[in-house]
């Protein structure tokens, strides 16, 4: 695998990836592992297909399987802090519009409450300094292939609403709670490595 990236930066960095057994999370886990990072994974359950796909079973320094939208998630806070995580990628989400339509409450819990738990851990963590959160291109009031970052945000159904609220939660943390030595980035993407690439 050929990767153009700053290997020196990533070497021995302690990185937590939520949704690490999903599509984006699994690819990022592989890439960061090849760059020399210590990769920690957090997902709500194991994805059998993912473990059949990878050849090296030692990609992860440690894996956690827990639903972030439940009270159980508070149990791993101390364990994550012990790991001295430096960088977090929050990809864990309910990512399907059709599922959100049929199960709106579960979608809200996963996408909003789950994100709150990660933001809260990040803000209280001594070691973590950088958090990147994935939302969606659906957060734009008028989604199109040509959206710009500063375009007006909005929502048209339950899925986009959950991601819109996720972005508002991030901004709220930035304004009211976030320590000055920490940074949060947002990624808004559509379908990745498939139709309608962004």
Where are these regions (language model features)?
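N-terminal Rossmann-like NAD(P)+-binding domain of SDR-like oxidoreductases, especially those catalyzing
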Residues: 1-190
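Short beta-loop-alpha junction of Rossmann-like oxidoreductase domains
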Residues: 142-144, 195-198
């Amino acid at each position: 695998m050929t990767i153009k990236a700053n290997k020196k930066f990533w070497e021995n960095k302690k990185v937590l990836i939520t949704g690490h057994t999903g599509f984006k999370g699994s690819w990022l886990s592989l890439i960061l592992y090849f760059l020399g990072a210590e990769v920690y994974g957090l997902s709500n359950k194991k994805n059998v297909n993912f473990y059949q796909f990878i050849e090296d079973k030692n990609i992860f320094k440690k894996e956690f399987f827990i639903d972030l939208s439940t009270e159980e998630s508070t149990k791993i806070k101390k364990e994550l802090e012990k790991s001295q995580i430096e960088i977090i990628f929050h990809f864990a989400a309910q990512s399907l519009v059709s599922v959100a339509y049929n199960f709106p409450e579960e979608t809200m819990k996963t996408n909003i409450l789950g994100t709150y738990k990660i933001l809260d851990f990040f803000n209280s963590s001594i070691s973590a300094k950088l958090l990147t959160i994935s939302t969606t291109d659906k957060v734009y009031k008028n989604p199109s292939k040509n959206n710009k970052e500063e375009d007006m945000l909005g929502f048209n159904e339950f899925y986009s609403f959950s991601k819109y609220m996720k972005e508002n939660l991030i901004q709220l943390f930035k304004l009211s709670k976030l320590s000055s030595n920490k940074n949060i980035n947002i990624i808004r993407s559509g379908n990745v490595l498939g139709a309608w690439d962004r």
